[in-house]
Design a protein with these regions (language model features):
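Short histidine/acidic/glycine/proline-rich micro-motifs that form metal-
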Residues: 99-100, 126, 154-159
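Beta-loop-alpha module in the N-terminal Rossmann-like domain of NAD(P)-dependent dehydrogenases
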Residues: 18, 48-112
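Rossmann-like NAD(P)H-binding beta-loop-alpha module
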Residues: 130-149
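Rossmann-like dinucleotide-binding domain that binds NAD(P)(H)
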Residues: 147-189
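Nucleotide donor/acceptor-binding cores
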Residues: 2-4, 91, 118, 147-148
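Rossmann-fold dehydrogenase core element
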Residues: 108-126, 145-150
Length: 189
């Protein structure tokens, strides 16, 4: 069985975690890594079996033509990373939340991915926490009856924590369509 080839861009803590996890799965092989910090890139390469490496994500992607393009970068780099992935022919693009910084950017990302026939996966790792899985199990068992109202709150950077709240609220309820929603924000604009 041939393995899916993976390029991971951004070798900080999260990128290193993704690369290590891909390599631990027998279906994947990290064939390239990318970071603009040369020392961090060298350290990551040594830990990952010395895959090809570089500081130019688009150039490395074009050279490697990975099946999977995974990036763990700042949110303002979403569109250039997705373009690089698609131009290299990647069929799966994996990245961290938030999906985008504006609703217009969501569509600017979504449309070229769809047109290329690729798939995108946004990491919501809270689903793998035992306490979140237990809540999902309890709700699915019917022990609480029909869920008809969900309340939630988040603090801190809205695109960081609120996206988790929205994700697992939808997940807990099998993506039942929302009927009504209300949101409020306070503080500096």
């Amino acid at each position: 069985m041939s393995k899916y080839t993976v390029l991971v861009v951004g070798m900080g803590k999260r990128g290193m975690h993704h690369a290590t996890t891909f390599n631990a799965n027998p279906k994947f092989k990290v064939t390239g890594i990318c970071d603009i910090d040369a020392a961090r890139l060298d350290a990551a390469a040594a830990k990952l079996g010395n895959p090809q490496k570089g500081a130019d994500a688009a150039g490395l992607a074009k050279a490697l033509k990975p099946d999977v393009f995974c990036f763990c970068t700042l949110p303002n780099l979403r569109l250039p990373m997705i373009r690089a992935a698609l131009e290299a022919g990647a069929k799966l693009i994996a990245f961290e939340k938030p999906v985008a910084l504006t609703s217009a950017e969501v569509f600017a990302l979504r449309d070229p991915i769809r047109q290329a026939g690729a798939k995108a996966v946004v990491s919501h790792q809270h689903r793998y926490g035992k306490h979140y899985q237990k809540v999902k199990e309890i709700i699915a068992s019917g022990a609480l009856g029909r869920v008809h109202t969900v309340y939630g709150s988040a603090t801190g950077w809205m695109t960081h924590m609120l996206s988790h709240l929205i994700d697992y609220t939808c997940w807990f309820n099998n993506y039942a369509p929302g009927v009504w929603a209300m949101a409020q924000a306070a503080g500096k604009s």
